[in-house]
């Protein structure tokens, strides 16, 4: 899930130029073909943690509460699972044959599904502009 979070927030950081940057920055880019302001904006943006970037988008774009809950509660559950030494050790020792029936792996899978549902809602359902950007730049 951490890789998905990093990938998703990388996309969001790029999309933030269009969705969250000031009109002046976007105008400077279009009218003057100057990327200086946009570069500075991105430089500041990428200094945030992935969870901060995600939270900013959820708040600024007024994404549905249900989506935010799915994303943050599932990620919190994932971190809690990783913090559980017994479960982490069990997953490390898990054989390929045991994956389909392992209770802890099933727990990870369930948490991951909820996180994926949140990402799908965020990128494709809750905000029209974000959906357009995802289809144009994120789906080849």
Protein language model annotation of sequence segments:
Residues 1-140:
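Conserved nucleotidyltransferase catalytic core and NTase-mimicking acidic/glycine-rich helix/loop elements
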